[in-house]
């Protein structure tokens, strides 16, 4: 079944709202690309509205980590996801989203990019 992102047919009171127009293709959505920590790197290129392209990162084990103290950015391996505010079950499944805390070779880092939409994992090193 398709994911539809249009307005609901019900008001907050429960009253039914009669549709002024039919459902359009532009209102369709897609399942989220839940980027997982894996040895295999897997990307998916999706055509978006206006013939634009979106790179969805599905699996990876690397991240571009920026160290603010030394002002240097390195590509390092990701071992696991430590915390994810988006969903508590993402921690067990090792799913990375924006704001997730990941364990890397350099230490703990916070993801600043949107891997499911940008196609890359960028993170900032957390100093304690």
From Swiss-Prot:
InterPro entries (alphabetical): Ribosomal_eS8, Ribosomal_eS8_CS, Ribosomal_protein_eS8_arc, Ribosomal_Se8/biogenesis_NSA2
GO biological process: translation
Coiled-coil region: none
Keyword hit for Transmembrane: no
Protein keywords: Ribonucleoprotein, Ribosomal protein
A GO molecular function held by the record: structural constituent of ribosome
GO cellular component: ribonucleoprotein complex; ribosome
Tagged with keyword Ribosomal protein: yes
Quaternary structure (record): Part of the 30S ribosomal subunit.
Family affiliation: Belongs to the eukaryotic ribosomal protein eS8 family.
Protein name per UniProt: Small ribosomal subunit protein eS8
Annotated source species: Methanococcus maripaludis (strain C5 / ATCC BAA-1333)
């Amino acid at each position: 079944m398709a994911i539809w992102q249009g307005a609901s047919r019900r008001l907050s009171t429960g009253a039914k709202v009669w549709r002024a127009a039919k459902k359009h293709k532009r209102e369709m959505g897609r399942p989220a690309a839940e980027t997982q920590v894996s040895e295999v790197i897997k990307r998916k290129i999706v055509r978006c509205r206006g013939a634009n392209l979106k790179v969805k990162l599905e699996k990876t084990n690397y991240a571009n980590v920026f160290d603010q103290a030394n002002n240097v950015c390195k590509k390092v391996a990701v071992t696991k996801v430590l915390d994810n505010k988006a969903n508590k079950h993402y921690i067990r499944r090792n799913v990375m989203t924006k704001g997730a805390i990941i364990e890397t070779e350099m230490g703990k880092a916070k993801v600043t990019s949107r891997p499911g939409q940008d196609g890359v994992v960028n993170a900032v090193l957390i100093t304690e």
